[in-house]
């Protein structure tokens, strides 16, 4: 038996369980530890029986509860090395100085300087090779923005993620900042190279998205193949090849193009979502389903639907029309993954 349960899918958090009788893998941990535990129990999955967490990429909606959950359950996490490093950078607390804070600090320093005794014999002026000499004032160093949590959200959360909500439920809040990125065990994999966890063979494949080293997955066990491909700007040839002959196909149907273009997002965000490293639209998925899709899957799960720029009815209608236009594909069942509650388990 191979079973797939989508715990959550969308711009606010993503997580899926792929399991057999002896092995259970969590794909992404994009909800808080508290919420992940709640949804695992609601879906009939025992969290204590998870054998590991595999990560697609480091955006917040895929890793929010990762560290706390992994430590609580004492299970390994599987990343690409680049994704792990990007996640560590994102999780590491940084002191960020706004321009207003810098001005306030400069004012305080100027006041202190005016009260301090001045030496009677002043030294030379700044040298010619220095265009500006800062005398006793703190320098303002703008810092890089933290990686945005998801391509589909116009607002970026600055700084490291909050852990207090999880800490109250799953563990004590770490006192040492290094604890934020401590994991029980880390296993690296490479896109295109298979690896095994228990009796599940995992094939990661590269996908086009604005992250460090994003991947999709095909999980195979007992002759059954389950594919997960979300957060991709378009379906590249390697992804199309990986998705062939899969019994379950979980694939992105993120936005309706008209809703996105007419919606409230800033134009820069709209461009990013529609770019080749953004998210797959209903229209782009329909083109794949009518063209390169082999019709093999018993179930097609539409995932990562935008709450702002899509409607479940639009996504389902678009996919069903695409599938219904080809006679060999009439046996495909279309399901919608939800943000607020787990999807009914798919058992093969």
Regions found by a protein language model. Give the residues of each.
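Cap/insert and terminal regions of metallo-dependent hydrolase folds
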Residues: 237-337
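Short, basic/aromatic-enriched C-terminal tail that caps enzymatic domains
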Residues: 332-348
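Active-site neighborhood of phospho(di)ester-bond hydrolases with catalytic His/Asp-centered motifs
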Residues: 27-30, 50-58, 78-81, 227-230, ...
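Active-site metal-binding motif and surrounding structural segment of the metallo-beta-lactamase
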Residues: 33-84
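Conserved beta-strand hairpin/beta-sheet module of binuclear metal-dependent hydrolase folds
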Residues: 1-43, 215-230, 248
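Metallo-beta-lactamase
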Residues: 83-122, 128, 134, 140-144, ...
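Metal-dependent catalytic neighborhoods of phosphoester/phosphodiester hydrolases
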Residues: 64-73, 89-94, 310-317
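Short, well-ordered alpha-helix to beta-strand connector turns
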Residues: 50, 183, 246-247
């Amino acid at each position: 038996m191979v079973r797939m349960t989508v715990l959550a899918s969308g711009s606010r958090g993503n997580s899926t369980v792929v399991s057999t009788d002896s092995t259970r893998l969590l794909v992404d941990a994009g909800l808080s530890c508290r919420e992940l535990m709640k949804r695992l129990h609601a879906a009939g999955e025992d969290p204590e029986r998870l054998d590991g967490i595999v990560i697609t990429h480091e955006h917040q909606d895929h890793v929010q509860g990762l560290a706390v959950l992994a430590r609580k359950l004492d299970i390994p996490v599987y990343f690409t090395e680049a994704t792990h490093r990007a996640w560590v950078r994102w999780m590491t607390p940084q002191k960020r100085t706004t321009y207003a804070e810098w001005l306030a600090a400069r004012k305080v320093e100027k006041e202190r300087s005016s009260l301090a005794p001045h030496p009677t014999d002043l030294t030379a002026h700044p040298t010619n090779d220095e265009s500006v000499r800062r005398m006793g004032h703190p320098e303002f160093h703008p810092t890089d923005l933290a990686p945005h949590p998801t391509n589909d959200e116009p607002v970026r959360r600055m700084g490291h993620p909050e852990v207090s909500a999880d800490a109250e439920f799953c563990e004590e809040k770490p006192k040492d900042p290094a604890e934020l990125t401590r994991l029980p065990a880390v296993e690296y994999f490479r896109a295109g190279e298979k690896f095994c966890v228990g009796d599940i063979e995992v094939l990661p494949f590269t996908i086009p998205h604005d992250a460090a080293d994003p991947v999709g997955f095909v999980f195979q066990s007992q002759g059954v193949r389950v594919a997960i491909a979300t957060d991709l700007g378009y379906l590249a040839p390697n992804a199309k090849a990986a998705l062939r002959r899969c019994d379950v196909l979980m694939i992105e149907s993120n936005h309706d193009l008209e809703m996105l273009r007419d919606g409230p997002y800033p134009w820069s965000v709209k461009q990013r979502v529609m770019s080749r490293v953004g998210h797959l639209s209903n229209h782009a998925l329909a083109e794949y389903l009518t063209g390169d899709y082999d019709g093999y899957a018993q179930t097609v799960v539409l995932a990562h639907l935008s709450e702002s720029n899509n409607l479940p009815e639009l996504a389902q209608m678009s996919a069903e029309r695409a599938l219904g236009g080809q006679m060999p594909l009439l046996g495909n069942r279309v399901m919608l993954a939800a943000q607020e509650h787990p999807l009914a388990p798919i058992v093969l």
